[in-house]
Design a protein with these regions (language model features):
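Beta-strand C-termini and the immediately following turn/loop, strongest in propeller blades
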Residues: 19, 24, 72-78, 97, ...
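Blade/loop signatures of beta-propeller domains
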Residues: 24-46, 173
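A short beta-strand motif characteristic of beta-propeller blades
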Residues: 46-52, 92-98, 134-144, 183-188, ...
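Blade-terminus and WD-like Trp-Asp/Gly-His loop motifs, strongest in beta-propeller folds
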Residues: 61-70, 106-116, 120, 151-160, ...
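Short loop/turn segments that connect beta-strands within beta-propeller blades
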Residues: 87-91, 129-133, 178-182, 224-228, ...
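Asp-box/WD-like beta-propeller blade repeats and closely related beta-sheet repeat scaffolds
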Residues: 98-171, 182, 186-193
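Conserved blade-ending motifs and adjacent loop-strand segments that build the rim/top face
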Residues: 239-240, 281-294, 317-341
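Blade-level signature of beta-propeller repeat domains, shared across WD40, Kelch, NHL, RCC1
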Residues: 333-371
Length: 371
């Protein structure tokens, strides 16, 4: 082989290494968006996908790209769960992955680059360009592990991803992956199941919970990103200070993007806002299910088990109804609602007529009806 031919061959290999690995990546599924007016609230709602079972990402971070142009979601329309982008302005859906069934573990839009998401496929962390569909392998998650991979989250500067894994039958680990160097380091190991791992968007802190599926002696924890200072986060150790005579169950926690506070559900008691020191205040009392805040923290979106969705004003606790009937057809649906990057939209999972994703443009709300 001549030097010129060899150089050409090596260049082709290099190009091939960055191209999407599977056949349906980049497929244009067209526009499936349909709109309706909620019969109770009068709010216009756009459902974005009609083919297959469609789901949003967990609400620990915005499901929108950094430029607010696309909403990232999953769908089973090809037979296995894959990731897609939906253009907010048009509703046009384009396929982002075509991985073998059961190999995708989670995805996280890059807050610093609008064209990039990070995903976990098998034990590899991939940087995927959602415009040209090229891929870069960031790193392979180092053993030992027996699974337990969860949705990655990004540090505020965009330089690191949290990685969660189950080391063995009794041990769980949180690690940090440097996305530029591909270097992984262990932050902490615990002898209990770890869940809801989230890097703070404002501070070098990682939040996590002792996951039991119910009450835990101490559910919420925070650790410095260098592994030091592991400590309980929100804690009320004196029963006299509990919001309820029953043991508290704190759940469905999420950082507030620009303030470094955290929203939490106090089960059957209400919605809490917790500061960086772990001190909480009750924003609104009631039996709510999930909560996420607008990036500036001024408003929250909350839902309940009856399939109703509200916009909540943080300062006053006033709320207004956005949507109803989210569990009318598919009872298993969890709304997992959250805001876009600018606070213009609310996105959520709905089972009103089928399992799909929907958005509400808050700038088009009818006259205020606060309660």
């Amino acid at each position: 082989m001549t030097v010129t031919r060899r150089a050409t061959f090596m260049l082709l290999l290099l190009i091939a290494a960055t191209l999407p690995a599977f056949g349906q990546v980049g497929r244009d599924w067209g526009v499936e968006r349909r709109s309706y007016q909620d019969p109770v609230s009068g709010v216009r709602i756009d459902e974005l996908a009609t083919v297959g079972v469609n789901d949003n990402l967990y609400f620990h971070f915005s499901n929108f790209t950094a430029d607010n142009r696309y909403l990232i979601f999953s769908s089973t329309r090809t037979g296995t769960p894959q990731f897609y982008r939906a253009e907010v302005s048009t509703g046009r859906i384009v396929q982002l992955t075509d991985s073998p069934g059961g190999t995708l573990r989670g995805i996280c839009p890059d807050r610093t680059r609008a064209d990039r998401v990070y995903l976990i496929r098998k034990d590899e962390v991939i940087a995927l360009n959602i415009l040209d569909f090229s891929e870069r392998r960031v790193a392979t998650i180092p053993p030992p592990f027996i699974g337990g991979f969860q949705q990655p989250t990004q540090s505020g500067d965009g330089q690191s991803l949290t990685i969660t894994k189950q080391v063995d039958e009794r041990t769980w680990e949180i690690g940090l992956l440097d996305v530029r160097r591909g270097e992984y380091r262990t932050v902490i190991r615990q002898g209990f199941r770890i869940g809801h791992v989230q890097h703070s968007p404002t501070d070098p802190l990682i939040f996590y919970v002792w996951e039991t599926g119910g009450y835990a002696p101490q559910r919420t924890w925070v650790v410095n990103s260098d592994g030091s200072g592991n400590r309980p986060f929100y804690a009320r150790t004196d029963p006299k200070s509990w919001f309820t005579p029953l043991k508290e169950w704190i759940t469905h926690e999420a950082w507030v993007e620009k303030t470094g506070e955290m929203t939490m559900i106090n089960d059957k008691q209400g919605v809490m806002l917790v500061d960086k020191a772990g001190v909480a205040r009750m924003v609104i009392e009631g039996d709510y299910w999930h909560v996420a805040a607008r990036p500036d923290g001024r408003f929250m979106v909350i839902d309940d088990n009856k399939g109703r969705l509200w916009l909540l004003e943080t300062a006053t606790g006033n709320r207004r109804l956005l949507a109803t009937g989210l569990r009318d057809t598919v009872r298993a649906v969890h709304a997992h609602a959250s805001f876009d990057r600018e606070g213009h939209y609310v996105q959520f999972h709905t089972g009103r007529t089928q399992e799909t994703i929907a958005i509400i443009d808050l700038r088009e709300l009818p006259g205020l009806k606060w309660q």
